[in-house]
Amino acid sequence: MSTETLQKETLGFQAEVKQLLQLMIHSLYSNKEIVLRELISNASDAADKLRFEALADNSLYGNDSDLKIRVSFDKQARTITISDNGIGMSREEVINNIGTIAKSGTKEFLQSLTGDQAKDANLIGQFGVGFYSAFIIADKVTLTTRRAGSNEAVRWESTGEGDYTLEPAEKESRGTDIVLHLREGEDEFLNDWKLKSIIRKYSDHITLPIVMKKSEWKDGEQVPTDEDETVNKASALWARNKSDISEQEYQEFYKHVSHDFENPLTWSHNRVEGKQEYISLLYIPSKAPFDLYDRERQHGIKLYVKRVFIMDDAEQLMPQYLRFVRGVIDSADLPLNVSREILQHSKDIEAIKTASVKRVLSMLEDLAENKPEEYAKFWKEFGRVLKEGPGEDFANKERIAGLLRFASTHADTDEQVVSFKDYIARMKEGQEAIYYITADSFAAAKHSPHLEIFRKKGIEVLLLSDRVDEWLVSSLTEFDGKKLQSVAKGDLDLGKLEDEAEKEQQKKTEDEYKPLVERIQAALGDSVKEVRVTHRLTDSPACLVAGEHDLSGNLERLLKAAGQKTPGSKPILEINPDHGIVQRLKDVTDEAKFADWAHLLFDQALLAEGGQLEDPAAFVRRVNAMLA
């Protein structure tokens, strides 16, 4: 270690840390007990990490393989100490783990806070505050740590005001000691019974023993003795019988594995025996974490082998579209030295993943069927992620599709409550397709001119405005034998929903307007693939549609916004022969004026579907000329 690092240094927190600390102290003050839960949870993680690293290097245990967490307090000094003999931290790890919040989206998260204490408490809980929660009850925190395998210790200290000090320290053994110097008015925590009841309430399920000194009554007060007692049950909750676990225990264990403040929506606890032996305890959260849409973020499944922690972001155990699932899988078959590479090619893991996915889908189906209000909450939080499923998981495509919910013209609100099953139950007699439209906003979808004939005939259309919807409909082309059909692509063929007389009249109109169609095509040139008469419009003069096998206008815009190349397919302009503007066009003989009218029709249709004009100045000039 260089001489520079052997002296005391004062370093500044990241700006976001400073802001978060202040917000947290105010927002979470009513839930002070979570401080102990968070710090014990971190100590438990440190022990898990030591066990895992010791699989490759047993010498890391030294002479101390009996892992535990110790909680003590000092009434005179007004301190609480949480100690563990886990992995410990090096100086660099202290800076990275405690001086920084190494999470993408931190600024955005902070901007989303409202100033409403109850709401902000939930948001901060979703963010996961961990160590920083200490400052809710402490005005100074001292952390002394020594990494397993190292002889050097480091002391970190801060009042949470904006900077912290780091200096070399003396520590006889590996692990971490955290001393909380309590704020004025927090003396309720300097009480043996209070601390033990908090530990039993929040941390009973921690697999490590959490020890405190036994206390006895002496001179009218409780005083600690020299004898240790284990405060928690210290057994793997998931390994116990379901009938022995209370709802509260399940909920507290969820908060431990997920670092969430809210109770989960539902969970599934299973012991599998036979070809593979494993236990799974899987939870569906009730709130989405702030970084849900970051596909690179850590997954939420902790993998254990025979109760030994292996890793806490085992992405091989759950597909991307279920990345919100939290929980534990404990296998009896995998080798203890299992690596990520082995996991990628393990048949056992593949079988566990397949079964776990089915379990999660069953949980969701059960919610949707028996607790629709709860499922509506789930959908609001995680629906857009579930929509990634049909494109990722071919084997379960139909089951996932059955869980999807959409807005539609049935209620004409942006609430996504319509399932494919609901839609099919309301289909018109003779209707063969499930109709939908994609757009970049609900308003654009709801007011699209493409819906006019469907509204007139009372045919329901799904209104898809999430970015993921384009990806969804490209991979989900039918449901329950019914084709999914975009109302903005290809020829409009309503099949049996139109009678022969209507079709006959349409054919006559197309023939009558053929010369006008050809003139508009000539005026627009390469801007369009084709011009044709439409019967999908009742109020608008024109609309743009994509060819049956072309990208929709909305998808093309999404890809361009993401910086991706597009095939550059041209749209089809459809004109409404019953509209006054189109009828007047037939009588325009001035070719320059006619060309302006044709371009205006095209530009208006482009704007109506949410597109951007290539030449806004030319559009304004033409509009001004018409108004003059």
From Swiss-Prot:
One annotated GO molecular function: unfolded protein binding
One GO CC annotation: cytoplasm
Record localization: Cytoplasm
Pfam family, one: HSP90
Chain segments carrying region B: 341-557
Main location: cytoplasm
Region (C): 558-628
InterPro entries: HATPase_C_sf, HSP90_C, Hsp90_fam, Hsp90_N, Ribosomal_Su5_D2-typ_SF
TM ranges: none
Domain of life the protein comes from: Bacteria
Keywords: ATP-binding, Chaperone, Cytoplasm, Nucleotide-binding, Stress response
Region (A): 1-340
Database matches in NCBIfam families: PRK05218.1 (NF003555)
Purpose: Molecular chaperone. Has ATPase activity.
Subunit structure: Homodimer.
UniProt record similarity statement: Belongs to the heat shock protein 90 family.
PANTHER family on file: HEAT SHOCK PROTEIN 90 FAMILY MEMBER (PTHR11528)
Name of the featured protein: Chaperone protein HtpG
Gene name for this UniProt entry: htpG1
